[in-house]
Amino acid sequence: MEIVLANPRGFCAGVDRAIAIVNRALECFNPPIYVRHEVVHNKFVVDDLRQRGAVFVDELDQVPDDSIVIFSAHGVSKAVQQEAERRGLKVFDATCPLVTKVHIEVTKYAREGTEAILIGHEGHPEVEGTMGQYDKLKGGDIYLVEDEADVAALEVRHPEKLAFVTQTTLSIDDTAKVIDALRAKFPNIQGPRKDDICYATQNRQDAVRDLAEKCDVVLVVGSPNSSNSNRLRELAERMGKAAYLVDNADQLEQSWFNDTCKIGVTAGASAPEILIKQVIQRLQDWGAQAPKELEGREENITFSLPKELRIHVTQA
C-alpha cells in the first residue's frame, strides 16, 4: 500500500493564533483561564489545553467575576461581547481575523439598513456569532440559508437593499451554487468581491480534490464537529472515493484498506500534525510504504496575537 499526503493540510493561521492565545494566557496569568466554546474544533487540542488549565464553558454565566475569558476562533455575537464588557471580564479575542472580516461586513450592512443573507450551517458557532453581529435597529434583518432550496423559500422585506456573506469553512462548490441562486432571485444583491470562504478552506479543498484523483481511499484527520473537515470528506466522496473522517489513529479500521493500492491522507484546518503522523504510523504498521507528499500551494500567512496579550507577554 502507498500513502499519499495532501499538501497543504492541517493547521491554518487562524487555528495557530487561537491556540497560541490560550497558551500565552495560561503562561502569563496562570490557570484557570476560561474559554467560551471549544477554541478550535479538535478534541486532541481541546483536551490538551484543558489539561494545562483551560476551562471550556458554553456561556459567560459559567465564568466567575474577575476572570479571564477567551472567545473561540469562531467568533461571538455582539450580545456576548457586551455581556463580557458589562461584567468587567478580561477578554482575549481569538476570533479568526477572516471571521472578523465577515463581522465587519455584516456590521456595515446593518448600519446602512441593508438586509443581509448569511450562507452557512445552522447551529455552527461561527454562524451564531455572525448572525449576532447584525444590529436590527436600522430596520434591516439578517437571514440564514444553507442551500438552494432555502434560497427558493426565502422571503426578505427589502429585496432592493440586500447583501450576502458566507461562513468561512463551507464547500466552495456548494457555496457557488447558492450564490448563483441568490443572484438569480435577487438581481440587485450585493456581495463581497470574493466570497468569504477562507484561503485555508480553499487550499485544502483544492488539495483533497488532487488527492482523490490519485488515491483509492481518502482519510481526513479531524473531529466530527469540524465544519471544514467534514467538507473535505464530502468532497472526496463526491469524486467517487471511499472517504473516512477520523479523530485519531485508533479510529482506523484495517478492513477499509482491503484491495487498496493508494491511501490518501489529509487533515482539517484544526487537526495537529502529530495526529497525522500517528495515522501514518498505524498504516505503516499494517504494511504501507513510507508516505509521499503531493506538491501543493505554499501557505505563509500568519496572524499576530492581540495587542493587549503581546503587551502582557512582554511585561511577563
Curated annotation (Swiss-Prot):
Q: How is the cofactor bound?
A: Binds 1 [4Fe-4S] cluster per subunit.
Q: Which sites bind dimethylallyl diphosphate?
A: 41, 74, 124, 226-228, 270
- Pathway(s) where this gene product acts: Isoprenoid biosynthesis; dimethylallyl diphosphate biosynthesis; dimethylallyl diphosphate from (2E)-4-hydroxy-3-methylbutenyl diphosphate: step 1/1; Isoprenoid biosynthesis; isopentenyl diphosphate biosynthesis via DXP pathway; isopentenyl diphosphate from 1-deoxy-D-xylulose 5-phosphate: step 6/6
- Cofactor(s) this protein requires: [4Fe-4S] cluster
Which reaction is the catalytic activity of this chain?
isopentenyl diphosphate + 2 oxidized [2Fe-2S]-[ferredoxin] + H2O = (2E)-4-hydroxy-3-methylbut-2-enyl diphosphate + 2 reduced [2Fe-2S]-[ferredoxin] + 2 H(+); dimethylallyl diphosphate + 2 oxidized [2Fe-2S]-[ferredoxin] + H2O = (2E)-4-hydroxy-3-methylbut-2-enyl diphosphate + 2 reduced [2Fe-2S]-[ferredoxin] + 2 H(+)
What does the entry list as the binding residues for [4Fe-4S] cluster? 12, 96, 198
Q: Name one GO molecular function term.
A: 4 iron, 4 sulfur cluster binding
Query: What EC class is this?
Result: oxidoreductase
| Statement: the UniProt record of this protein carries the keyword Disulfide bond | no
The lineage's top-level taxon is Bacteria
GO process annotations (BP): dimethylallyl diphosphate biosynthetic process; isopentenyl diphosphate biosynthetic process, methylerythritol 4-phosphate pathway; terpenoid biosynthetic process
Query: What's this protein's function?
Result: Catalyzes the conversion of 1-hydroxy-2-methyl-2-(E)-butenyl 4-diphosphate (HMBPP) into a mixture of isopentenyl diphosphate (IPP) and dimethylallyl diphosphate (DMAPP). Acts in the terminal step of the DOXP/MEP pathway for isoprenoid precursor biosynthesis.
Q: What is this protein called?
A: 4-hydroxy-3-methylbut-2-enyl diphosphate reductase
According to its UniProt entry, this protein's organism is Acinetobacter baumannii (strain ATCC 17978 / DSM 105126 / CIP 53.77 / LMG 1025 / NCDC KC755 / 5377)
